[in-house]
Design a protein with these regions (language model features):
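Bacterial N-terminal signal peptides that target proteins for export
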Residues: 4-16
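Bacterial N-terminal signal peptides
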Residues: 15-24
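N-terminal "mature-domain start" segment
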Residues: 31-56
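Surface-exposed amphipathic alpha-helical segments
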Residues: 40, 48-49, 141-179
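Conserved polar/disulfide-associated segments of primarily extracytoplasmic proteins
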Residues: 53-140, 148
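Secretory-pathway-linked proteins and extracytosolic
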Residues: 193-251
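Secondary-structure boundary elements
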Residues: 238-309, 370
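Hydrophobic/aromatic-rich core segments of domains that either
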Residues: 316-395
């Protein structure tokens, strides 16, 4: 990997330990920050507050009441400029030090930098720039913390990594992860679903990159264990994993769909959706069960690792099915439960059985991934709908 901050990239791949304490927030964001005019969004960790903004609405400063991290979001009008140059120009205005690099994120030229600067204190942080859908406009993100608060780096990376500049690429790896883990070439994967052999592939970097994202987001999630926004933080944790991991198995999702669905539609067109969903459910029910040996690590097995044969638990399996069904145009989500320590998959396929009422008012069919049962069945001791939290992925 030839990157200007190879040492920083090695740090990215290392789990950091937060030494900060979170207390109850008086107010803070628990939903996405979005701009409809320019078409971008940020799914930042819970609790950020607007500290300041410009009257033209083009610059915002966000602070966090419990974590010493500042986020600057600026819309820049820079005709005939490159993303890298826009970032460099703005860092120079702050007398910030650090190299700036350019790279392609979803085929779009972007700028990235890790920097240090001195304002009222000494700070370190990350910055990115990316072009927006309106020509000659860029979004600039700077996220930083005091130099003596290195434990904040995961929080900073997670914040910037949540940027989306095009809804078409919502569920693809984030901007920093994409920079740190460039493609290394295809790796073959052989799947057996419903008795059929399906040859597919992932990228050689996907296992390491997906695990990095999981470790990163798990560190952020742990900050909210006793927080009043724990539920929202938990939902975000799974959204961030889905976004990264779904993008890594799009080839596999297509290969699975093309091998199974057309034949089902030809034989029984009226039942093709539920039969396809059942083939996927029966497949993951055969996976080996595995949880993290270390309680400090996430139990979540990455989706690329799951389809490569590594053991998994209920949440990994549920997310895998959700990715595959969403790829097929069959809306799907997962349900998670703190009380049951369990996860299930749900889908908007009309069929008999147990359902869960989603926020859109529709009844989604429940799928249990760890017991060998059909769609629409759930254990009686897991049937209290108030104990389940929905996590949706296509918003």
């Amino acid at each position: 990997m030839t990157r200007f901050f190879a040492d920083r990239t090695r740090l990215l791949r290392t789990a950091f330990a937060f030494v900060l304490m979170l207390f109850i927030l008086p107010f803070g964001f628990s939903e996405k920050i979005s701009d409809r005019d320019f078409g971008f969004s940020l799914d930042v960790p819970e609790g950020f507050e607007v500290a300041d903004y410009t009257t033209d609405g083009m610059s915002y400063f966000f602070s966090h009441p419990n974590i010493p991290v500042t986020l600057v979001m600026k819309i820049c009008n820079e005709p005939s400029s490159r993303a890298k140059d826009v970032l460099k120009k703005n860092l120079e205005k702050l007398s910030a030090k650090g190299d700036t690099d350019s790279f392609l994120w979803n085929q779009t030229p972007c700028g990235i930098s890790s920097f240090t600067m001195t304002l009222d204190d000494n700070y370190f942080g990350w910055g990115v720039t990316a072009p927006l859908k309106i020509q000659d406009y860029y979004v600039l993100l700077l996220c930083y913390a005091p130099e003596n608060q290195k434990g904040c780096e995961q929080f900073i990376i997670s914040t910037i990594n949540s940027l989306c500049i095009d809804a078409e690429y919502l569920n693809t790896p984030g901007i920093i992860t994409s920079y740190a883990f460039p493609s290394e070439g295809k790796k073959s994967v052989l799947l057996t679903i419903g008795g059929k052999k399906i040859q597919t592939s992932i990228d050689k970097s996907d296992l390491e990159a997906a695990k990095f994202t999981i470790d990163l987001e798990y560190a952020v999630l742990n900050l909210y264990a006793n927080h009043k926004l724990w539920k929202e933080a938990w939902q975000r944790y799974y959204r961030m994993i889905y976004r990264d991991n779904a993008g890594r198995i799009q080839t596999a999702a297509g290969d699975i769909y093309n091998e199974l669905y057309p034949e089902l539609r030809l034989k029984t067109p009226q039942d093709a959706d539920i039969k396809y969903a059942q083939a996927l459910l029966s497949w993951v029910q055969t996976f080996n069960y595995e949880r993290a040996a270390n309680s400090k690590e996430s139990d979540f097995t990455s989706i690329p690792a799951s389809i490569s044969g590594k053991g998994s638990d209920c949440d990994s399996r549920s997310m895998l099915i959700s990715i595959l069904l969403n790829y097929a145009g069959l809306d799907s989500a997962i349900l998670i439960s703190r009380e049951y320590s369990h996860a299930v998959v749900v889908t908007d396929i009309p069929a008999p059985g147990q359902t869960f009422t989603m926020e859109n008012g529709r009844e989604y069919l429940i799928g249990e991934t760890t017991a060998k049962v059909t769609w629409g069945m759930i254990a009686q001791d897991h049937a209290d709908r108030t104990k389940w939290i929905p996590v949706t992925f296509n918003e």
